[in-house]
């Protein structure tokens, strides 16, 4: 494995929900167990009621990201990050213009065992 610069240039973004797009830049082709990529909000949006099957760190490059879990809201602004543990049930919320980077472990969380 070699050291690699990660950018969102030329990555295909796909819509997760209206207003929220993801582009994967860390895949099993480039690392052993990490997954990750970029997220951007083209409008105010939320992705509700997701139960994580992995540990995740979300870093906010610009804008504001909010995670709601167990009735508690955690907001991160530019330069801040949020840690979400495996098993947490969350709602992701972002404002239009928010851009972030996410890293998760393990990358193959949805693999059949």
Located regions from the model:
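Structural motif
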Residues: 57, 64-66, 73, 89, ...
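Short, conserved beta-strand element in jelly-roll/cupin
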Residues: 40, 51-67
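Short strand-coil-strand connectors
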Residues: 30, 68-72, 95
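Short acidic-glycine-tyrosine-enriched beta hairpin
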Residues: 71-86
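A short, N-terminal "cap"/entry segment at the start of jelly-roll beta-barrel domains
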Residues: 1-38
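Conserved short histidine dyad/triad with adjacent acidic residue
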Residues: 35-52, 86
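Ligand-binding loop in jelly-roll beta-barrel domains
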Residues: 86-110
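A cytosolic small-molecule/anion-sensing beta-strand core signal
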Residues: 61-62, 78, 96
């Amino acid at each position: 494995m070699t050291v690699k610069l990660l950018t969102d240039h030329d990555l295909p973004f796909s819509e997760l929900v209206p207003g929220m797009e993801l582009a994967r830049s860390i895949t099993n082709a480039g690392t052993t167990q990490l997954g990750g990529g970029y997220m951007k909000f083209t409008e105010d949006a939320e992705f509700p009621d997701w139960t994580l099957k992995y540990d995740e760190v979300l870093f906010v490059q610009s804008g504001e990201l909010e995670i709601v879990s167990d009735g508690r809201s955690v907001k991160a602004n530019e330069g801040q990050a949020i840690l979400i543990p495996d098993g947490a049930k969350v709602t992701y919320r972002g404002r239009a213009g928010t851009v972030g980077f996410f890293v998760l472990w393990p990358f193959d969380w949805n693999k059949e065992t």
